[in-house]
Amino acid sequence: MSDKPLTNLNFSSFDLHPALLTGLTRAGFTLCTPIQALTLPVALAGRDIAGQAQTGTGKTLAFLVVVVNRLLSSPGLVNRNPEDPRALILAPTRELAIQIYNDAVKFGGNLGLRFALIYGGVDYDRQREMLRKGADVVIATPGRLIDYLKQHEVVSLRVCEICVLDEADRMFDLGFIKDIRFILRRLPERCSRQTLLFSATLSHRVLELAYEYMNEPEKLVAETESVTTTRVRQRIYFPAEEEKIPLLLGLLSRNEGMRTMVFVNTKVFVEGVARALDEAGYRVGVLSGDVPQRKRETLLNRFQKGQLEILVATDVAARGLHIDGVNYVYNYDLPFDAEDYVHRIGRTARLGADGDAISFACERYAMSLPDIEAYIEQKIPVAAVTAELLAPLSRPGRASNGNGDTVGDISPHSRDVLVAQEWRRGKPRGSPGERDGRIRVCKGTRSDGGGGRRRTKFRLETERDSSVDGAVTPVFGVSTGIVSAPGKEVGRNIGLRRRSRSMDSGESGHVVATADQVAAKSGSQPSLLGRIGRRIRSLLSMF
């Protein structure tokens, strides 16, 4: 991305269809960005292109102009069936596919072309019916498109004139390469169609794909002074793990009213960060793989409109999202991959705007920093963690978000993992119960009349042992999720809470025994505890 995102080259200087040129002008597009100025002369002549450009440079508009101009300037086959689209645009994520569709409709919606948006997570039959009715341009994610291709009568690519692969490097990262090859093999021969490939990096594997399925593609690179734009002001803090939330709240309180994205490495901890922000009075949305597609679209729309102040996300949102006006990007966790760092901070400072990227390098993820700095070819300025920053400034009263809880729906599996990890650190959370060695999360009851947080306990119940009297059921309260083997010392936070209730408590035929009582009653009890301990340690080691 250049510091001057627009060139002096006007769209009217190209031989574009008059209706397309009118649509571009009406949508506010008059001057080309550098990648558009490089792409259009070659692509409008019918050549294949392998283009490299960072996010936010205008490459989406570049290939949309080429696609729409080709379809308007040349008539389709007379015997083309409704299920035969003339153009195909592939995107790695649903969010990117939606954004491409919105951009296409913005300037091409009134040009007589039919656009079909195909992606997973929404009504399958409705999309299938849309394809059967016919579309000129199909914008799709690979998985859902393959589902329809295998049905034969829904969609066919036999007469497709132009194909676009956007974010090709991301296709590899997400494991879509087999799907892409499956789709490309169903297109016409490469000499009888035009193919445009765009990627943030033209790595060896991306170029290998280009040369295998494209017709002598011309390699185009939008030159940049650095991997990251100089308009992104980067800085990094080195907080302790327990300082990250206070530091985040302190920094946010000093930048009120700014549209902000916070990136977390795992969806397990997304909810914890989001809830901390929510309890601090911020209007927060969660974007991760566990949030249903319709809710994701709603969250993005509300964030775009300013109804949400902060979007907490995993890397599912790091690429392809065109959200205007993001002022701050926080890397709550440093990413493992240096490219992910570039794509994360690329959410801000788009198309010449300024932005800030603030990263936290805690002891868990600081190891990624040398690779990131080597990749971006610069040292990230270090800022000190001070007591003043750890104390958030006072905020005005929280306004209602008007739409219920915005923290998002995290899957039960993610909750189990979070509980287990906090359990291991000696901080019990939630109220899982144990049945046959499996930890599960149970809903608790509010202790304050419904207005406060749910307070529950973490409990582990052993199986009924056949060698013990049927009226005796041992119940052991476990404070940390780790049961020590017999004869070993138990740590301060790791131990068995032995509870006993009198038979006079009113529970007929049910006696709660202590560990010593059960051991005395049954010689097999130590092995049962050992099995439980091994089971829990095995569960924790998975995460």
Curated annotation (Swiss-Prot):
Name of encoding gene: rhlB
Entry keyword set: ATP-binding, Cytoplasm, Helicase, Hydrolase, Nucleotide-binding, RNA-binding
Sequence motif: DEAD box, positions: 166-169
Family membership noted in the UniProt record: Belongs to the DEAD box helicase family. RhlB subfamily.
Residue span of region Disordered: 424-454
Lineage: Bacteria, Pseudomonadati, Pseudomonadota, Gammaproteobacteria, Lysobacterales
Gene Ontology molecular function, alphabetical: ATP binding; ATP hydrolysis activity; RNA binding; RNA helicase activity
InterPro entries given in the database record: DEAD/DEAH_box_helicase_dom, DEAD_box_RNA_helicase, Helicase_ATP-bd, Helicase_C-like, P-loop_NTPase, RhlB, RNA-helicase_DEAD-box_CS, RNA_helicase_ATP-dep_RhlB
Broadest EC class assigned to this enzyme: hydrolase
Name of the featured protein: ATP-dependent RNA helicase RhlB
Compartments where located: Cytoplasm
Chief subcellular location: cytoplasm
Keyword Isomerase in record: no
Enzyme Commission number: 3.6.4.13
UniProt subunit comment: Component of the RNA degradosome, which is a multiprotein complex involved in RNA processing and mRNA degradation.
GO cellular component, one term: cytosol
